[in-house]
């Protein structure tokens, strides 16, 4: 789960990390009031969306007076911001973050991720801040330095100092960086994070470190024990179909194809998408209905899949383990009748009572194409999507 920059900076402040003073604003009036409460004569207004690349897309602006901040608010609030990390529709801008301007001498990068290979939280730093870190890793990997955190000790000051030396920091800056490093390592574990990023971490002209930006991604599997973070979730930034699926305990990810997929089991779902691609088709989604493929869940899954107007056919691929295929077949028939599916539906059943399940589908009178194998199902779905 992503947090907005202003939310991330609230958490940064809880951990005594250096952030500028700012206000989240939902109207032009609030933005105008914000600059009156902030110090300085230059401020920064930022669109709050769950995507990077805001600056290049025009979503970040230096403002010098009330007229400029009002104009920026009127331009963006209620609109959608398109960046290189969004789709063509962009993300809705419902909030601006207005903060004090900063005098910047250097821009650095500081981030942390959970590295599954080493089973450690790994920090990364670079002297190339303020740019896409993926480009730095690809083009100049020697400028990216890493530090793994021992889960027994947490982040240690000496590790922070070592990274500070590699960044070319001097004097009191080293002490400041070590503090930031230790507190971020603590935050990462205590808040159940999946990613933590400051890009850029700046050295001001006064020689101090400042977290100019802040990005937090929370591990969604841990939200049950992070109620305060859960309350920060912004549904407007999520695909509405994905949000609806989550409310029904369905795992759904929207894609850009035209063959809807309904599968039980994440591994089988990925395999189904692969075989659709292998036979020349394009999956419209990833959807795992889980172990209990009941009529109700199948019906909701159909509704979510068919809410995508690009879907021209649906492939249902169910492996009956504990759940019997004959019961699944009855659930599919009931769901198709209830939802009113108007595109071809290809169903492949395998496992417990699969022959009986296929017989029930064949005798149902419902417009369902029964497939005997996964390959057959994929071929049939691709043909159906092409109108053949």
Curated annotation (Swiss-Prot):
Its EC number is 6.2.1.5. PROSITE patterns: ATP_GRASP, SUCCINYL_COA_LIG_3. ATP binds at residues 46, 53-55, 99, 102, 107. The gene is sucC. It comes from Pasteurella multocida (strain Pm70). The keyword Magnesium applies. One of its GO terms (biological process) is tricarboxylic acid cycle. Residues 9-244 form the ATP-grasp domain. InterPro entries: ATP-grasp (IPR011761), ATP-grasp_succ-CoA_synth-type (IPR013650), ATP_grasp_subdomain_1 (IPR013815), Succ-CoA_synthase_bsu_CS (IPR017866), SUCC_ACL_C (IPR005811), Succ_CoA_ligase-like_bsu (IPR005809), Succinyl-CoA_synth-like (IPR016102). Binds 1 Mg(2+) ion per subunit. GO terms for cellular component: cytosol; succinate-CoA ligase complex. It is an enzyme of class 6 (ligase). It catalyses: succinate + ATP + CoA = succinyl-CoA + ADP + phosphate; GTP + succinate + CoA = succinyl-CoA + GDP + phosphate. Its cofactor is Mg(2+). Heterotetramer of two alpha and two beta subunits. SUPFAM superfamilies: Glutathione synthetase ATP-binding domain-like (SSF56059), Succinyl-CoA synthetase domains (SSF52210). Pathway: Carbohydrate metabolism; tricarboxylic acid cycle; succinate from succinyl-CoA (ligase route): step 1/1. Succinyl-CoA synthetase functions in the citric acid cycle (TCA), coupling the hydrolysis of succinyl-CoA to the synthesis of either ATP or GTP and thus represents the only step of substrate-level phosphorylation in the TCA. The beta subunit provides nucleotide specificity of the enzyme and binds the substrate succinate, while the binding sites for coenzyme A and phosphate are found in the alpha subunit. The keyword Methyltransferase does not apply. Belongs to the succinate/malate CoA ligase beta subunit family. This is Succinate--CoA ligase [ADP-forming] subunit beta. Keywords: ATP-binding, Ligase, Magnesium, Metal-binding, Nucleotide-binding, Tricarboxylic acid cycle. Substrate binds at residues 264, 321-323.
């Amino acid at each position: 789960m992503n947090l907005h920059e202003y939310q991330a900076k609230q958490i940064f402040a809880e951990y005594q990390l250096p952030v500028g003073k700012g206000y989240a604003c939902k109207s032009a009036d609030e933005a105008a009031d914000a600059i009156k409460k902030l110090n300085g004569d230059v401020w920064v207004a930022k669109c709050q969306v769950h995507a990077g690349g805001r600056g290049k897309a025009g979503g970040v602006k230096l403002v010098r007076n009330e007229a400029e901040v009002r104009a920026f608010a009127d331009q963006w609030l209620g609109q959608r911001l398109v960046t290189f990390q969004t789709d063509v529709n962009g993300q809705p801008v419902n909030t601006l973050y207005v903060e004090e301007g900063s005098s910047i001498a250097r821009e650095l990068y500081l981030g942390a991720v959970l590295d599954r290979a080493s089973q450690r939280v790994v920090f990364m730093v670079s002297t190339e801040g303020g740019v896409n870190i993926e480009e730095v890793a690809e083009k100049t990997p020697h400028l990216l330095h890493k530090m793994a955190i021992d889960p027994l000790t947490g982040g240690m000051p000496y590790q922070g100092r070592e990274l500070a030396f590699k960044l070319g920091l001097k004097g009191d800056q080293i002490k400041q960086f070590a503090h930031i490093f230790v507190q971020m390592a603590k935050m990462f574990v205590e808040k159940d994070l999946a990613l933590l990023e400051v890009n850029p971490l700046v050295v001001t002209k006064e020689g101090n470190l400042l977290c100019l930006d802040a990005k937090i991604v929370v591990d969604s599997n841990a939200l049950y024990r992070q109620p305060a973070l859960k309350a920060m979730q912004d549904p407007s930034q999520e695909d509405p179909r994905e949000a609806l699926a989550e409310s029904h305990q369905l795992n759904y990810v929207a894609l850009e194809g035209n063959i809807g997929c309904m599968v039980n089991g994440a591994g089988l779902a990925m395999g189904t998408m692969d075989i659709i691609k292998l036979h020349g088709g394009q999956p419209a989604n990833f959807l795992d209905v889980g172990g209990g493929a009941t009529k109700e869940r199948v019906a909701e899954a159909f509704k979510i899949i068919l809410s995508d107007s690009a879907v021209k056919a649906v492939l249902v691929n169910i492996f009956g383990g504990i759940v019997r295929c004959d019961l699944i077949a009855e659930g599919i028939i009931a769901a198709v009748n209830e939802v009113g599916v108007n595109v071809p539906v290809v169903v492949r059943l395998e496992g417990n009572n699969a022959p009986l399940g296929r017989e029930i589908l064949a005798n149902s009178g419902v417009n369902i194409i029964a497939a005997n194998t996964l390959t057959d199902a994929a071929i049939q779905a691709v043909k159906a999507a092409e109108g053949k």
